[in-house]
Amino acid sequence: MNAEFSRTLSLLRQEKGVSQRAAAGALGISQALLSHYENGIREPGLPFVVRACDYYGVSADFLLGRT
């Protein structure tokens, strides 16, 4: 992943107006893991990317910074 993914993931959550804890619960991960994704510490697998796209209503290309 790249820095654009982390930034976009964080911005989408903020635009939705939810906390990391709430978003993490909806996405089936811990708040700490979501924080790591948003800060570029860890890289998610494909299942998380798909869930995040569904949750935020965006395409994978958008989430991954390809558009």
For each of these PLM feature ranges, what is it?
Residues M1-E15:
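A short, Lys/Arg-rich alpha-helix, primarily the initiator
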Residues T8, S19, G45-F48, S59:
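Residues that mark the N-terminal boundary/hinge immediately upstream of a DNA-recognition element
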Residues Q14, G25, D54:
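Alpha-helical residues within the helix-turn-helix
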Residues G17-N39:
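Short alpha-helical DNA-recognition segment
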Residues G28, P47-F62:
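DNA major-groove recognition helix of helix-turn-helix/homeodomain DNA-binding modules
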Residues E38, F48, T67:
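DNA major-groove recognition helix of helix-turn-helix
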